[in-house]
Amino acid sequence: MALFSYKTGVWPISLEIAGARLSLNQDGSVQLQLGATEIGQGADTVFSQMVAETLQTDMAHVHIQTVQDTDVSPFDTGAYASRQSFVTGTAVKHCAEILRDKILAYAKTLLPEVDTRELSLHDNWIWAGEEQAISLAALAEESYYSLTNSSVLTAEVSEQVKKNTIATGCCFAEVEVDIKLGKIKILHIINVHDSGKLLNPQLAEMQVHGGMSMGMGYGISEQLILDEK
């Protein structure tokens, strides 16, 4: 049996900061730029999911730049300490909220007769109350090409996070050991995690599977044998 308590991020030991940049494209899709790095843990999927949920659009309409360039990418301190969903995700959500508000503010200039409080964004449409007013694609095209009311809609944030989340859990493993042969057989494993709200349950489950595999490797002193030739 093994128990764990795991903290997300490194605050207050060190700095936790992340940037995000969003722009509304001409076809109504959005472009997301980050300094955070996708290294196989599913970060890009979660960030795209957060933008899509905030803007009430399809994930297919969120184009994320997965190759970072420190000359132009928003600043981010890196991929470590299981921080990206929590720290960079905070920046992504805030950035998407700003872009959403800018979209609705621009929609108001196209629909002067509608009360701003009645405007909402979902299903790739601007709604006035319960009626579709203008599609997001049409609004985006107008924002780029209007001769009298052009305003390319973008948002950018830099978010410092001064709090952490704590995950806890335990793992039970039943093993069979042949002492004479040194052979180990894993009969049964049970993992129990209290992870809080899961942004993407399938990705979280896969990380548990990965951690379980690593734990088995540590337990039997697994090593990678290299051929120097």
What annotation goes with each model-predicted range?
Residues 1-229:
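Cofactor-binding beta-sheet edge motifs in enzyme active sites
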